[in-house]
A protein has these predicted regions:
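Extracytoplasmic catalytic/substrate-binding loops of multi-pass membrane glycan-assembly enzymes
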Residues: 223-225, 510-513
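Membrane-water interface segments at the C-terminal ends of transmembrane alpha-helices
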Residues: 1-30, 43-165, 189-220, 233-235, ...
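Glycine/proline-centered hinge or cleavage motifs at structural transition points of membrane proteins
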Residues: 178-179, 192, 465-466, 479
C-alpha cells in the first residue's frame, strides 16, 4: 500500500508539477532560439516575458498590500469578537475560494463598467468606471486590481484569523489591564506573535494573484499577466516561450513556499524584528493609537466589511439582477435578440453548449475528485506517520499555489505529443490536470481533521485489543476523519468545477462551463454570459452551504 501510494503520488502529482522545468532543460536549444536568439525578432520574446512578469509582480504586490490594510482588522474582528452574523461574514469571506473565477470576473466587469451595474443604479448613462481606467503610481488596470483583491482577500483573512485564534489571550488581557489601548496592545503583543501568519497569508495571496487566469481573462482588456501570456503563447504554438515562462513561475512558487513552511513551523513563537522606534516617534504613535481607539473603532471594524460587500456581494447581486432584466429582451433597445432566452434557445443555441459543458464539467470534477480521494487518503496517513511526511506535505503545497496555466502546460507537455504521447487534448487530459491540484486540497482537509483528533491514540487502543492495522484504520481512523474527507471531497469538486486557466490549455474540444463563459464574452453573447455566470455562482453558493453544514457537525 505504501509503495502504491507513493508511486501514484509521483506519477499523478509530483511529475506533472515539475516536468515543465525539466522540459525547458531538455529542449534548451529550442528555448534559446525562440526566446533569446530568434533569427527574425531577436530577443523580443524575452523582453515580453520580462514586461509581463514585471506587470504581474506590480499587480500582485498592490493587491496584497491592499488586502493587508483591510484584511488584518477583519481577521482580528473574526478571531476575537462575537456578534450576530459572524458565520455569515465568514462565509462571505470564504466565497471567492469556491467561486468559479470566470463567472466572478464577468460579474465584476458588468458591475463596474456597464450601465447594467452600479452606473445604472446611480442614474448614469454608462458604467461607473471605464474599462481602461488605470491606478496611478502602480500603473495597474483598476478592474484587474479589483478582481485580484477579491480573489486574494480570503487568503489573508482566513490565514491570519486562524493564527490569531491559536494565540493565548493572557498577554493581551494583561496589557489592557495595565492601561494600554486596543491598538497599542495589538502592536506590542499580538502583532509580533501573528507575524508568521501575516507572512504566510501574504505569500499565499501573492502566489494566488500571480497565477490567477479565469477572471483576469475577462477583465484584462489589452493587459496581459504571466498566466494569460502562457495561455496565449500556447494557443499560438510558441511552446518554448510558454514553457520558459511557466518554469519561471514554478520556480517562483517553490521559492515562495519554502519560507512559509519555515515560519509555519514556528508554533507559538514570535517573529522578532531588531528595530525600535525612537522615543519621540513612539509617543506620537501612542497618541494616534489612543485617538484611533476612541474615535475610529467603528471605522476600523466596518470599512473592511464595506470593501468585502463592494468586491464580492455587489457583483453577485448585479449579475443576478441582469439575468432578470435581460430575460426576454434587451431592456434598453427592446430587441428580442438581446435577451437571455433568445441566445440560449435561438439560432446560437447556447443552451445546448451549456448542457454539454455542464456534463463535461461534472464528469471531470467527479472523476478527478474520486481518483484524488483514492490517492489522498492513504497519503495523509503516510504524511502523519513517516519521517519523510513533512517533505511530501511541503511538495503538495506547490500545486496549490502554482499558476494553473503553468500546470496545464506542464501536463500537456508531459502526457501529450511532446512527452509520453499517451493522451491528446480532451476530457481525460483535463482530468489528469485537475488531479494534480485536487490531491493537495483533499490531503489538507483530511490532515486538519486528523490533527484535530486523537486518531493515533484510538488506533493504538484498537491494535492493543487485537485489531489488525487494516481493521484499525477502517473501523477507527477513517470514521474519526470522515468530516475532513467529506470537506475535502466538496472543496476538490468545487475547485475542479470552477478551474479555468489550466483547463483552457488542455481541454481541446471538451469545453467546461468556466471556459464557456470566456468564449461567450469573447463572442459578445453577453446575455448568455449573464445566465451562465449566474448558474456558476449559484452552484458555488450551494457548495459553500454544503461545506458549512458538514463542517458544523
Amino acid at each position: 500500500m505504501t509503495w502504491a501510494t507513493l508511486i501514484a503520488f509521483i506519477v499523478f502529482v509530483l511529475l506533472p508539477t515539475f516536468y515543465l522545468i525539466s522540459y525547458v532543460f531538455l529542449s534548451w536549444n529550442d528555448v534559446r532560439v525562440e526566446v533569446f536568439e530568434n533569427p527574425i525578432i531577436g530577443d523580443e520574446n524575452w523582453k515580453q516575458i520580462q514586461k509581463v512578469l514585471f506587470f504581474s509582480f506590480r499587480l500582485s504586490l498592490s493587491a496584497v498590500a491592499f488586502d493587508l490594510i483591510f484584511g488584518i482588522p477583519l481577521a482580528y474582528v473574526l478571531a476575537r469578537k462575537r456578534f450576530r452574523g459572524k458565520d455569515l461574514l465568514e462565509d462571505i469571506v470564504t466565497l471567492p475560494l469556491v467561486m468559479p473565477t470566470s463567472g466572478f470576473g464577468f460579474a465584476t466587469l458588468i458591475t463596474w463598467t456597464t450601465v447594467a451595474g452600479i452606473g445604472g443604479f446611480l442614474g448614469l448613462s454608462s458604467g461607473l468606471v471605464p474599462l481602461d481606467t488605470v491606478i496611478p503610481i502602480v500603473n495597474v488596470p483598476l478592474m484587474v486590481f479589483i478582481v485580484h483583491v477579491a480573489l486574494t482577500f480570503p487568503y489573508i483573512v482566513r490565514t491570519l484569523e486562524t493564527k490569531i485564534q491559536s494565540i493565548d489571550t493572557t498577554f493581551e488581557m494583561a496589557s489592557r489591564t495595565l492601561g494600554a489601548t486596543p491598538l497599542t496592545t495589538f502592536r506590542n503583543v499580538l502583532l509580533p506573535l501573528a507575524l508568521p501568519g501575516i507572512f504566510s497569508g501574504s505569500v499565499l495571496a501573492f502566489a494566488r494573484s500571480l497565477g490567477e487566469t479565469g477572471a483576469t481573462l475577462i477583465v484584462a482588456g489589452v493587459s496581459s499577466t504571466a498566466s494569460i501570456a502562457i495561455v496565449r503563447w500556447t494557443a499560438e504554438f510558441k511552446l518554448a516561450t510558454a514553457s520558459f515562462m511557466g518554469s519561471l513561475l514554478v520556480i517562483i512558487a517553490w521559492v515562495l513556499i519554502l519560507p512559509v513552511e519555515v515560519y509555519m513551523g514556528r508554533r507559538g513563537k514570535a517573529l522578532r524584528i531588531p528595530f525600535h522606534l525612537p522615543p519621540s516617534v513612539l509617543k506620537g504613535v501612542m497618541r494616534v493609537e489612543r485617538y484611533a481607539s476612541r474615535k475610529l473603532t467603528r471605522v476600523k471594524d466596518f470599512t473592511p466589511i464595506v470593501v468585502l460587500v463592494l468586491t464580492v456581494i455587489v457583483p453577485i447581486l448585479v449579475v443576478f439582477n441582469s439575468v432578470v432584466l435581460y430575460w426576454s429582451a434587451d431592456p434598453y433597445t427592446g430587441k428580442v435578440q438581446g435577451g437571455v432566452l433568445y441566445q440560449l434557445f435561438g439560432p446560437s443555441n447556447y443552451f445546448n453548449l451549456l448542457t454539454k459543458a455542464t456534463l463535461t464539467s461534472i464528469i471531470v470534477a467527479l472523476v478527478s475528485t474520486y481518483i484524488s480521494m483514492c490517492i489522498a487518503i492513504p497519503l495523509t496517513f503516510l504524511i502523519e506517520r513517516k519521517r519523510y511526511g513533512v517533505i511530501i506535505r511541503s511538495v503538495l503545497k506547490i500545486p496549490l499555489i502554482i499558476p494553473t496555466s503553468s500546470l496545464g502546460l506542464s501536463v500537456l507537455l508531459l502526457w501529450g505529443s511532446n512527452g509520453f504521447n499517451l493522451i491528446s487534448s480532451g476530457i481525460w487530459l483535463t482530468i489528469l490536470t485537475h488531479i494534480v491540484f485536487s490531491v493537495p486540497v483533499v490531503v489538507e482537509s483530511i490532515l486538519a481533521a486528523y490533527e484535530g483528533s486523537d486518531v493515533q491514540m484510538y488506533e493504538d487502543s484498537a491494535r492493543t485489543l487485537g485489531a489488525t492495522a487494516y481493521n484499525a484504520i477502517e473501523t477507527v481512523s477513517l470514521p474519526l476523519v470522515k468530516g475532513g474527507i467529506l470537506t475535502g471531497f466538496i472543496l476538490s469538486f468545487a475547485h475542479s468545477l470552477g478551474e479555468t486557466g489550466a483547463t483552457f490549455i488542455v481541454m481541446g474540444r471538451d469545453i467546461t462551463v468556466p471556459a464557456l463563459v470566456v468564449n461567450m464574452v469573447e463572442a459578445l453573447a453577453i446575455p448568455a454570459a449573464f445566465f451562465t455566470s449566474t448558474y456558476l455562482i449559484a452552484l458555488s453558493l450551494i457548495l459553500l452551504a454544503i461545506i458549512r453544514v458538514t463542517t458544523r457537525r
